[in-house]
Structure formats: C-alpha cells, structure tokens
Amino acid sequence: MEKKQGIGFFERYLTIWVALCIVIGIAIGQYLPAIPQTLSKFEYANVSIPVAILIWLMIYPMMLKVDFQSVKNVGKRPKGIVITCMTNWVIKPFTMFGIAYLFFYVIFKSLIPAGLAEEYLAGAVLLGAAPCTAMVFVWSHLTKGDAAYTLVQVAVNDLIILVAFAPIVAFLLGVGGVSIPWDTLILSVVLFVVIPLSAGIVTRIMVIRRKGIDYFNTVFVRKFDNYTVGGLLLTLIILFSFQGETILNNPLHIVLIAVPLVLQTVLIFFVAYGWAKWWKLHHNVAAPAGMIGASNFFELAVAVAISLFGLQSGATLATVVGVLVEVPVMLMLVRIANNTKSWFPEKLS
C-alpha cells in the first residue's frame, strides 16, 4: 500500500510560523538591537553573509530534488510545458508589475509614501519573476498531479531562471523607475541559483552512482528537510529583527502589500488552468501547471531583495509578505482545482 503523502506539518502552518517569526524578530530588534547591529557587519558586496548561508540551506535541498535529466522528455507532451513557460515568463512578471503598480501607486497612494511604494513594487517584481520550485511538488501531489510531468515542468523553469530572471527583473524595475546595480543582480543569481543548482546536480549524480536512486530519494534527500525548515525560520527572524521599526510604524502595510500579491496569485492560477482547459489537457497536467505559475520561488526573491536593497528595505518586506500569504492562498487553489476536476477530459492529453 502506498504511503499517504501530503503537505507536511511545517508547510501546512507556514503562515503561523511566519507570524511567530515576525513577533520574535521584532522583539529582538527592539530589545536586543546589538544582534542585528552585529549581523549587519558581516556583508560582502551588499550580500549579508549569515543570510546567504541560511538561504543556501533552503535552496540547495530544493535543487537536489530536481532531476534535470527529465528535460529530455520535454518534447513528448509539450502542451503543458508551453503553458507553464508562457505563463511564468511571458505573462506573470508583467501582470505582477501591473497589479502591484496599480495598488501601490494608485489605489493605495494616500496610504503608502512614494519611496516605500517604489520598494514594495520592487519586491513584488522579484516575486513575480521567480516561479516556484520545491513547494510545487506538494501542490502537485495534493491535486493528484502527474509527478513525472511536474518534475519536467519544474526542471525546465529552473533552467530558464538562469537566463531570464535577471533581464526581466532589470527591465521591469527600470520601467518602474527603480535603479538597480546590474553587477549585484548578476551576483545574486550566481549565488542563489547557479551555485546551489550546480551543487545539487553534482551531489545528485555522485550519490546516485554510489548508493542508487532509491537511497537518494528515500534517505539522502530527507536528511535535509530540517535544514530547510531551520534555514527559513532563522532567515525570517533575522529579516524581521531589521524590519521591526518599519512594521511597527506601518502595521497596515502588511495587509496593503498582501492584497495585490493575493490577487496576482489567483489570476495567474486561472490563466494557466483555463489555458489548460482550453487545450483539453488532462487534470493531472493542468493543475500543476496552474500551481507552478501561481506560487513563487520566494526564497530566491527574498535573497535577491536583500542583496539589491538591503535587509531593512521595503522590497525585502514585500517578498516576506509573499511567504506569509502563499500557503493559505495555495491551499484554497488546491481545493478549487480538486473541485473542478470534471472540467477536464479523463484521457491523457
């Protein structure tokens, strides 16, 4: 009998853990200010070294799970890949920019100062340009998605990130009037995508050669689960120890940032999901296609926001709000996908 799987305890209550990290981080910033002051000294090229290490602990295990050899199967059933790539790279970054600009600069203009609106827009753009990696496997499972095909979708997107993320971010931030140092942006992509991706590929090949694929999937990869959890929690606490003053002065801004992020998530899900219905794809391909577009690679977005704008920036705060809202919104979309399975043909497309 197949072991029942689903969203883990930590992932299910991620919003609660993030809320606790907000409280702990703010408390540290207010009552133990020496801690963030000391951490701020450990920087290189605007990159916080402690945070970089923690983010590697999050991203490296994700890259271990992706079998990039699966990309060779991309031509067998191309429609789902086309939907995923077009949604993630041609539609999503631009709708995120448009929705965020509308809310931060127009609808919430009287509530958000112009300087902060610019930073929040930058954070939203970073989220919109980074499609999800690790959590997609959870959402795919919860919607009874085709696991092998989801793997191909994720692998293709991770490879596209290498070449498309930096130009798209630079272009959209330039349109929004946000100046960014290209060298820092490229360094961020190298640090938080190229290095962990390369390390993941090398590790995967070496371990599978020595121990086999079953050992790798059932034993080796699972050893890193706690590191990922710990890395995320500690990163959030550090971030909020720097962000405490901003949050205490503007508590409503958490909600204001969340509104366009939630709307964008729902919109992109229905764009990809509706496209899959139009092309008559099977539900086990359509649902993961919608989930990949809807969710974000928030670890990468947080890392790049810190590198480009700093730990205390509004851009970093916006990316962290993305972490806060992601799980409850995605669970809602999982429910919608499962309740609309009858929209799709029974036979594989």
Residue ranges of each PLM-predicted region?
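Alpha-helical transmembrane segments of multi-pass small-molecule/ion transporters
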Residues: 1-64, 69-294, 298-349
